[in-house]
Amino acid sequence: MLKLLLGDPNARKLKRYQPIVSDIQLLEEEIAPLSDDELRGRTAAFQERLANAGSLANQRPILDEILPEAFAVVREAGKRVLGMRHFDVQLIGGMVLHEGQIAEMKTGEGKTLVATLPSYLNALTGRGVHVVTVNDYLARRDAEWMGQVHRFLGLSVGLIQQDMRPEERRRNYNCDITYATNSELGFDYLRDNMAADISEVVQREFQYCVIDEVDSILIDEARTPLIISGQVERPQEKYQQAAEVANALARAAELSKDGIDPEGDYEVDEKQRSCTLTDEGFAKAEQMLGVADLFNPQDPWAHYITNALKAKELFVKDVNYIVRDGEAVIVDEFTGRVMPGRRWSDGQHQAIEAKEALAIQSETQTLASITYQNFFLLYPRLAGMTGTAKTEEVEFEKTYKLETTIVPTNRVRARQDWADQVYKTEAAKWRAVANETAEIHKNGRPVLVGTTSVEKSELLSSLLAEQEIPHNLLNAKPENVERESEIVAQAGRAGAVTIATNMAGRGTDIILGGNSDYMARLKLREVLLGRLVKPEEDHTPPVPLQRSAPGGFSDAAAPSLPRSGESLYPCPLTDDTDQALGQLARDLVKAWGDRALTVIELEERIATAAEKAPTEAPQIQALREAIARVKGEYDAVVKQEESRVREAGGLHVIGTERHESRRVDNQLRGRAGRQGDPGSTRFFLSLGDNLLRIFGGDRVAGLMNAFRVEEDMPIESGMLTRSLEGAQKKVETYYYDIRKQVFEYDEVMNNQRRAVYSERRRVLDGRALKKQVIGYGERTMGEIVEAYVNPDLPPEEWDLDQLVGKVKEFIYLLEDLTPDQVQGLGMEELKAFLQEQLRNAYDLKEGQIEQQRPGLMREAERFFILQQIDTLWREHLQAMDALRESVGLRGYGQKDPLIEYKNEGYDMFLEMMTNMRRNVIYSMFMFQPQAPKN
């Protein structure tokens, strides 16, 4: 009703951008005739104008003013360098991002290209722009691919990758535009705030940030904080014993009601992801361990047993983690990717290692941490893009103060979303998925099946193998991850079948008929690998499509394949081209050396050759011509295949379970029907799926009994669909509340973190260190007076002996101070007198130390302040964690846990800062440098 009265707010926003789009089109005609150098000259002119404006506040209005011309310049550069012209809707997307909003753009609408517009505009200030992606591969791809536009226009482009050294990172952060992943940015921020010297700091001040797949980073990952930790020794045998106890205990069939324990040793609440021992379970565990009390502070066991039970019940192998090279490696539940190097905290990872009988690694202690929510709020202007933001609009608005604008698609969507099919049992569902896949495959259409775990993808793989259907498997198993882009490059070919966990949803578009450009690059990689790459480099050859054994990994020939050629390539190359490639390989060996490159170096050179940017290097030129030649031959076949696939109905996407979030379902659907292509989607569900089991409740159980249908009969019911959507909304609200709680609690830490980090940065910059330490001393003297002097008592009753004794403890240089000297002074006079004494003593100390070596006093000041900040902050983080754990129980006493946490946390913080000041003063006066030996 409101929409009818007031009009659609989104449409109103879009209308506002229309005149600017017209301005850009007019400017385009003026800019098109410019030479490359003249086009680059525009960048220099913009930069000069902004440099004269000075502060960021003065630059903002100028940025808005030059936006139409800057966007027209980028549009022209895109045409010249990439052969891609920004559509009008992409210009609108760029404006939405420049204003610091979230642009919702459907899959295949060219979000990556949109980001070039606001990145270029905001980089002109010289303050740096960060473009954030979800993984290293996408960051590298975007920096290489879109970076060409920026480099062509005279801006520098940086890239941050996981294994870079600090000096490389600093160089890349100092570029005008830096591509990085969210985790690298966050960890660099934390490491910078642990640096012992300003030369170790790699980032500069934040200015503007564009996040690709913003929902994945700001929402899906918002529950897990970034943590840098140090190792703590804990007895390993405790984890092993706890795992044995957990295995011997029996799970209760139901949860406790009205405080009465169910039958069994422990209960599992899957919704809250928690395990709790019953009274019977406590008794059994204590008996097995031979202890009187699991909670004994001298020999605590409760924590180990709880973690072991969680490892047994809630952390499932090949779903939550995989075992690789003797280690338990986490699998990201949203993307399905493995996260090597990341570990669950609080002893949980060790419990999983004990369960799997792996070597148990040391437990860790938090040295620094921050949530993504608070990290990204450090940027003065933040923007993001995604295909699916509207479902989380409220959260973006409330947590990040980010508006969402839906950008219209360039072409009308032609995708058909077919009704869900729900089966009574899981086995029936998987049979139906395999049958539909086989049916669509026979019609010559490509199929993408999305699964929720490694285990499920392998189950479907074996079902398809039974029907002898060739397919590719894409999941977090290491042998498949390497081939992700190769598999996706051919997922749109006629009759191709691809099974993927959630990981395949991001970054690489599925092109109908296959991606001839990428296949040409792979062909060159295959030809050159053996000749140019070091033999010990572990490289995997491209993966062909003909795979039909269980797991999709044998080379058995498929019976009915609409394919030419035996490999992943659309057709064999002509003899002439084959010979030309052989000659190219020989020429490159002469130029670059026999097997002298790494795989990554070779791939980077092929990627550079595949770009359109001008190059002087003759070898890159030759590579470029070879790629074009191979692509030309493939194109003929791919174009025919594309029209066959279009006529057959395009890509069909099958979902095999509703995800907890509607957004992830929409991302999977969005793989089909990109840019107006034909396509279709369908979800297959069973009443045993996690979502329905955990959140669907009794209503669905009732339905199961009501439907007296055959196993293989699908159920389609409006009531069931509503139940499903209700369950998803319930889950989304539940997780939103958790994220909100994480945010509210971390907000308390955030204010403290900012105070500590800004104090630390002041010290690193070496600004007025002496003044800072004297300030600490003056406050300490004031605190000593307040501790030993009661203004309500007459001065003759003040305990001046103890007061003077305490002052001498801190400042041994005042050993001649006596109570008589301070007799008769009022409270404020006493403070002023002692502060004056402190300043004199400090000058004396400085004189002594500077005699040893000039500048030593400043070094000592910096060392002691940093040492105290780091040690006490680390202890404070642990204390705050413990407070957070215990404060929850106060809800039972009718107190708000968050308010209790804020108040006590604030008191603890003040105490920490007081201790830091006192320890620094004490250390500075006690500092006795050794005289250098001659």
From Swiss-Prot:
One of its GO terms (cellular component) is cytosol. GO terms for biological process: intracellular protein transmembrane transport; protein import; protein targeting; protein transport by the Sec complex. Its EC number is 7.4.2.8. Residues 535-565 are annotated as: Disordered. ATP binds at Q90, G108, E109, G110, K111, T112, D509. Pfam families: P-loop_SecA (PF21090), SecA_DEAD (PF07517), SecA_PP_bind (PF01043), SecA_SW (PF07516). GO terms for molecular function: ATP binding; protein-exporting ATPase activity. Transmembrane segments: none annotated. Keywords: ATP-binding, Cell inner membrane, Cell membrane, Cytoplasm, Membrane, Nucleotide-binding, Protein transport, Thylakoid, Translocase, Translocation, Transport. It is an enzyme of class 7 (translocase). Part of the Sec protein translocase complex. Interacts with the SecYEG preprotein conducting channel. Has a central role in coupling the hydrolysis of ATP to the transfer of proteins into and across the cell membrane, serving as an ATP-driven molecular motor driving the stepwise translocation of polypeptide chains across the membrane. Probably participates in protein translocation into and across both the cytoplasmic and thylakoid membranes in cyanobacterial cells. NCBIfam families: secA. Monomer and homodimer. Part of the essential Sec protein translocation apparatus which comprises SecA, SecYEG and auxiliary proteins SecDF. Other proteins may also be involved. Belongs to the SecA family. This is Protein translocase subunit SecA. The lineage of its organism: Bacteria, Bacillati, Cyanobacteriota, Cyanophyceae, Synechococcales.
